[in-house]
UniProtKB/Swiss-Prot annotation:
Protein name: tRNA pseudouridine synthase B
Catalytic reaction list: uridine(55) in tRNA = pseudouridine(55) in tRNA
A Gene Ontology molecular function term of the record: RNA binding
Enzyme Commission number(s) from the entry: 5.4.99.25
Family statement: Belongs to the pseudouridine synthase TruB family. Type 1 subfamily.
CDD domains assigned to the protein according to its UniProt record, in alphabetical order: PseudoU_synth_EcTruB, PUA_TruB_bacterial
Function: Responsible for synthesis of pseudouridine from uracil-55 in the psi GC loop of transfer RNAs.
Length: 285
């Protein structure tokens, strides 16, 4: 069975992102399957999965911004920063004013620095951070730069629960955001709920449950639909040159940019690099 495209999967809580990939492999009977960005096992939500030749372009889909709905529960913090971990601190919970909450949240908008959670797959010195954590080894975690485009207070269920919505750049750790918000509020807390509602143009409304996928109700989308580069349609001669690994003359009014390349029938053939007067192939479909 030849399946080349992207599936917008609604990952349920309790499964790893790799579990979802294995599920898709079995359902479609194909080996080449890869997701476009890990979602924590306890989290649910949008997980775009590339299949077949579309897996060549997974890295381009990983660049997309993401949106999450999440809940902070005040009263205790954990080593994993979510509800699955061991309690490391507990304390009384004050009643916050909405003004105080908004004032603190405003400090996390724009470009910020985060320390990734120790229980994460982020690599430091060649090892994943959770490997250090499981062995009880100390490691210095360098901060990363991320961008928070939107951070909205959805509901304050006083005094213990805060529901928020965030739109952020790739690589943002929501658990770390929760940790840092709690630190600013001077109250122990953890992330008690997380759902990813958007990854670029993939949204939760158009995602498919595993049951729908199993029943054959899911629609596989063409991967180029979700790659955000300028499009260039080539004539037959130029298409053949690109497919044979050769460069072509850049007469398409695109400069110093990655471009989506289409043949003279409008069929996607890959990604090219426009450099000055030339366009060369970078990754072919």
């Amino acid at each position: 069975m030849s399946v080349d495209g992207v599936l917008n999967v609604l990952k349920p809580p309790g499964m790893t992102s790799h579990d979802v990939v294995d599920f898709i492999r079995k359902i479609y009977g194909i080996k080449k399957v890869g997701h476009t960005g890990t979602l924590d096992p306890d989290a649910a939500g949008v997980l775009p999965v590339c299949m077949g030749r579309a897996t060549k372009f997974t890295s381009y889909l990983m660049e997309h911004d993401k949106r999450y709905r999440f809940e902070i529960t005040f009263g205790f913090s954990t080593d994993t920063l979510d509800k699955s971990g061991k309690i490391v601190e507990s304390g009384p919970v004050p009643l916050f004013t909405l003004e105080k909450l908004q004032e603190v949240l405003s400090q996390f908008k724009g470009e910020i620095q985060q320390i990734p959670p120790i229980y994460s797959a982020k690599k430091v010195k060649g090892k994943k951070l959770y490997e250090y954590a499981r062995k009880g080894e100390e490691v210095e975690i360098p901060p990363i730069k991320v961008t928070v485009y939107e951070l909205e207070l959805i509901k304050y269920d006083a005094p213990h629960h805060l529901l928020l919505d965030v739109k952020c750049s790739k690589g943002t750790y929501v658990r770390a955001l929760v940790r840092d918000i709690c630190k600013k509020l001077e109250v122990p807390g953890h992330m008690s709920f997380l759902i990813r509602t958007e990854v670029g143009d993939f949204d939760i409304e158009s995602s498919y449950t595993l049951e729908e996928i199993k029943e054959g109700k899911a629609e596989v989308q063409p991967v180029d639909k979700f790659i955000k580069f300028p499009s260039v349609e080539l004539d037959e001669v130029s298409s053949n040159k690109i497919l044979n690994g050769q460069f072509i003359r850049n007469t398409y009014n695109v400069e110093n940019s990655l471009v989506k390349l289409y043949d003279n029938h409008g069929i996607f053939i890959g990604i090219g690099v426009a450099e000055g007067e030339k366009i060369r192939p970078k990754r072919l479909f």
